[in-house]
Regions:
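Short acidic-hydrophobic, aromatic-tinged amphipathic segments that line or gate anion-handling sites
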Residues: 181-182
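Nucleotide-sugar donor-binding catalytic core of glycosyltransferases
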Residues: 9-178
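Active-site proximal beta-strand in glycosyltransferases
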Residues: 1-7
Length: 182
């Protein structure tokens, strides 16, 4: 099972793909969090299977839909869980989308954005405390939208009962009914 998505355009794409291919001759089946349809690899296609990022009820057990809301939309940007803080002089294409979204909202939407505008990412309970204050959350993964590819943040958002918006090109509508995901 490999949790990091394998999407061309993600800064870790080559490293992630190399890791998957490393022991190809020893592995019978792969379970990854990206659609096998979009992966170009030396691994035989029949060995690659999609496995959505699981929600663990021991971790994602919040009923955030019950909490008082101060914000309309939550978004959190980070350079990856292993970094803790944003890298200096880093560039992330998602920031352009967020800037445009905020501009187009004409101050009619109250945003809670972590990882931009001088606000460092938050983790664990600090992250949950921020998330539960918003009516909805936006799930944008690095590398752009690709079929079924998402960071593990999708489990945190949906598993804690937050209405989640995701790019339609990720095709999660294959798994959810209308009204369950935006």
């Amino acid at each position: 099972w490999y949790e990091d998505h394998v999407v061309k355009g993600d800064p870790n794409y080559k490293k992630n793909l190399d890791l998957l291919e490393q022991n190809n001759d020893l592995i019978d089946q792969y379970f990854i969090t990206t659609s096998p349809d979009v992966i170009k690899s030396k691994i035989t296609k029949s060995k690659i299977n999609f496995l959505p990022i699981p929600v663990d009820p021991n971790i994602e057990n919040g009923h955030f839909y019950e909490s008082k809301k101060e914000n309309d939309l939550f978004f959190a940007l980070s350079n990856g869980v292993n970094y803790g803080k944003l890298k200096k002089n880093s560039h992330d294409e998602r920031s352009f989308f967020i800037n445009k979204l905020i501009s187009l909202s004409n101050d009619k939407i109250k945003f809670n954005v972590l990882g931009l505008y001088g606000e460092q990412p938050k983790w664990n309970y600090d992250f949950y405390d921020e998330l539960m204050l918003s009516k909805t959350a936006l799930n944008l993964s690095r590398g752009g939208p690709n079929k079924y590819a998402s960071s593990n943040r999708i489990a945190t958002l949906i598993g804690n009962g937050v209405l989640t918006a995701i790019d339609e090109n990720v095709q999660y509508q294959d798994f959810f009914n209308n009204g369950e995901i935006i």
